[in-house]
Each structure stands twice: as C-alpha cells, then as structure tokens.
Amino acid sequence: MVHVRKNHLTMTAEEKRRFVHAVLEIKRRGIYDRFVKLHIQINSTDYLDKETGKRLGHVNPGFLPWHRQYLLKFEQALQKVDPRVTLPYWDWTTDHGENSPLWSDTFMGGNGRPGDRRVMTGPFARRNGWKLNISVIPEGPEDPALNGNYTHDDRDYLVRDFGTLTPDLPTPQELEQTLDLTVYDCPPWNHTSGGTPPYESFRNHLEGYTKFAWEPRLGKLHGAAHVWTGGHMMYIGSPNDPVFFLNHCMIDRCWALWQARHPDVPHYLPTVPTQDVPDLNTPLGPWHTKTPADLLDHTRFYTYDQ
C-alpha cells in the first residue's frame, strides 16, 4: 500500500495524536535513539574512514537519496506501532513563526525557555518524559558537517532557540529559484558546488551550503529550518528533535517537486563511479540495500498530498 504524506496543517487532530503516539512508543522501545545514533555516525570521522572516505548523508550528492531511505526506515518503524501513520511535512515557505500549529502543546511543543533554552511544553519536553540519551555538540571552530568532529553533549533535555541565529525561514521565492535549477549536482560534489553561475547544483542549494549572488546569506532552505529552530536542530544529533523529520520530509518533497518539474534531466548525479561520493549505483550505508537509482521514484513507497 502506498501511503500519502501530508502537510501537518491539513492533518486532523486524530492523525496528529497517532503520529505523536507512534513517535513516543518507538522512543520508549529504544528504536528512536538508534535513528539519532545513526545520523551522528554517518557524519563522524570514524564512519567516513570505514566507508573509504565516501560521504553519504551530507555535503554531497547522496544527501537526498540517503535521507529518503533514512525517512523510509523511520516511517516503517512508526507503522509497526500504527500502520495508519505517515510522516508529515513542514512547509516552512508559508508556515512561519512560533505561533504556527506546528509548535502546539499537543504536537511538537514550543520554543525553549529563556536562559538554558530547555523546551518545557508538549510531548517532547523533558518533564513530560522525552529524555535525550545520545547527543553531541561540535568540537573545534570548523563546521563539523565538513570535518566530522563532535564531542559529547551532556544535556538530557531538548533545546530550541527560535529565530536567534537567523531571523528568517525560507521564502517561496527562494524555493522556486532553487527548483528552477536544471542540474542535480556538479563537481566538486561538496559544499562549494554550484556557488557561481550557472549555479549547477540543485542539491547544494537545497541543502543550504551555497546561494545565488543576490541572496543575503548562506544557510537557506534545509539549513535555514535547522538554524531557525536552533538548539539541538543545529547539530548532527538533530533527530533528537522530532521536528527534524518534518523538515526532512519537506526536503524530500522538494526533491520530488524538482523531479516532476524536470522530467528529462538526470535526477541524480554522478551516474558513474566518482571518488569520495556515492554514484547512481552505490549501495547506501549503513544498510547497503538500496542505491540512489532504487530511490529515485518515491511513488513506489509513498506520495505527497500536493
């Protein structure tokens, strides 16, 4: 059966209740923390060494197919609790601000309190039972997404800090300009790809490591949602905040929209073996069960409501 992923704004109260219940249940069973640990591991220096240096989940062409498989695995875990549950998405181009229903006390909970920025409301507050068991913070001044260096974070509570590090969530114009790009990715297949005309890296613009010359700052789209939310969403342990999955569901939807807009171009690059990055036929670790080619058609697994 192919499920439909919805904008959280169109979900019924019962659908939201079921989703939250399933998330809490896989957390109780220890399954949720495995997803947090995996997301940390795939960007660590240790994992990069084991995988012969190939980056799989971030800052490379594999960003989109790797997270597509990751979300599928997470969604399947939820569906073992409740087969009716599907992942919702957060369309941050129109759904702005901390007064959004996204942050209600019965769904994601709200912003962190002043001072330590601890989340105090909703099902994912520490005082309501949501304990962080695996968390890291950056080590050293360089962007850890580039060097893979992290150290232990001993806070066992979820932290958010809305709008402090960037005041703005993505705009419809930002997304449209990125969706208009016709090349999936380009050499050198990293955080610098597509940063100059003709801007040939849809992946890197969507991931947020590059920008158009007329845009004011780096960190747009995917990156902006992480940075605007702040707190634990800033680090590679970001799945500790369940809103991570709504953000990445939106990113996956953007890839699907881009594919539909450009049916006649390669939907993944590189197509041939390439040093340091996964090509079209590289089995994606740690599962090694699917390649980017296997994941191009999302309608085999689910559809989006729009």
From Swiss-Prot:
Recorded E.C. number(s)?
1.10.3.15, 1.10.3.4
Q: What is known about regulation of its activity?
A: Inhibited by 3-amino-4-hydroxybenzensulfonic acid, 4-hydroxy-3-nitrobenzaldehyde, L-tyrosine, p-hydroxybenzaldehyde. Activated by the copper chaperone GriE.
Main enzyme class? oxidoreductase
Q: Which SUPFAM superfamilies match?
A: Di-copper centre-containing domain (SSF48056)
Which GO molecular function terms does the record list?
Answer: copper ion binding; o-aminophenol oxidase activity
Cofactor requirements of the protein:
Cu(2+)
Positions of Cu(2+) A binding: H39, H58, H67
Cofactor note from UniProt? Binds 2 copper ions per subunit.
**What follows loss of this gene?**
Cells lacking griE and griF show accumulation of the 3-amino-4-hydroxybenzaldehyde (3,4-AHBAL) intermediate.
Please give the superkingdom of this protein's source: Bacteria
Identify the residues that bind Cu(2+) B.
H222, H226, H248
Q: Which UniProt keywords apply?
A: Antibiotic biosynthesis, Copper, Metal-binding, Oxidoreductase
The family annotation for this protein states: Belongs to the tyrosinase family.
What protein name is recorded for this chain?
A: Grixazone synthase
* Organism expressing this protein natively: Streptomyces griseus subsp. griseus (strain JCM 4626 / CBS 651.72 / NBRC 13350 / KCC S-0626 / ISP 5235)
